[in-house]
Curated annotation (Swiss-Prot):
EC primary class: hydrolase
Full protein name: N-acetyldiaminopimelate deacetylase
Reactions performed catalytically: N-acetyl-(2S,6S)-2,6-diaminopimelate + H2O = (2S,6S)-2,6-diaminopimelate + acetate
Superkingdom of origin organism: Bacteria
Amino acid sequence: MKLDELAAIRRDLHQIPELGFQEYKTQAYLLNHLAKHPEGRIEIEKWRTGLFVKVKGTAPEKILAYRADMDGLSIREDTGYSFSSVHQDRMHACGHDFHMTIALGIIDHFVRHPVKQDLLFLFQPAEEGPGGAEPMLESDLFKKWEPSMITALHIAPELPVGTIGTKSGLLFANTSELVIELEGKGGHAAYPHLAEDMVVAASSLVTQMQSIVARNVDPLDSAVITIGTITGGSAQNIIAQEARLEGTIRTLSPASMEQVKKRIEAMVRGLETAYQCSGKVSYPAAYYQVCNSSDLVEDFMQFVSENGLAEVVRSKEAMTGEDFGYMLKKYPGFMFWLGVDSPYGLHHAKLQPKEEALETAVRVMTAYFSSKAN
């Protein structure tokens, strides 16, 4: 598939971003494209709003898998593209339009150039939330088509086109959503001594939590606690009865994640005493770390470099989260960054990845799978 064909698909998908488990138009678009392939070369199974697509090998003994996430984000696009999102306040701001396009390009190649082994392509919904990888792994289809290895990529705005980046072991952090709900006794702004101010309580808690990383996490490890939103109160002259804090926790080890959560919960218990309120801590979604299989990823990097398929750089661990980690927890495999050279980063309303990177990714993955599946 040539670059202009890949770009056309990407632009179509870019216009129809949908949130997790709402990817109905996206699924329909993918099915329509896949229907163009000769009957008998591929098998397609729907799974919720996602797809399992198997490209049949000539004499299969195993299955090699590739995963592409599908969902968009709740962001109002500001790219100025002529092919901007037609869904208000929805955008493919994390490159999932790229990821799906690349998967379609790889499928197209192997339909026309069969290899010995079966290739399984997973179009996974809800990576951005509430998380599609775990329920997809638990589906009967994964039992039917169990892979011997699994791979994925993610666009990297900071890397130039023609470059990929990855590493052995830990690549992406453990991540967890965080919600804290506080409830006390509201009242009139003129009588603070008769009320329990949850805005003040929430502010105090945010300040306290800044000490957790500095004093409760191993200095040789890393962790980030970010409170992204605080809501509370209803009017300027009413002391807030309730407050809600939402954020994320990110750590480079499961042990640090457990420690951070314990400290947050202890601080909330202390807050209940100090401010005579009640507090509830919850973690609506959590993603396991992305940990690459060292032997497979080292072999992949060597293969790409020796064959001149792309420039290869060794990445550092990133605090980004990815539910692909659950797939790597169960199956050998790896993930890598794909350079797309955008002046704006992931989850930015002006993210503008260069489409030439589509060709790089398809070239790399078709060559790699050809070497491993024959």
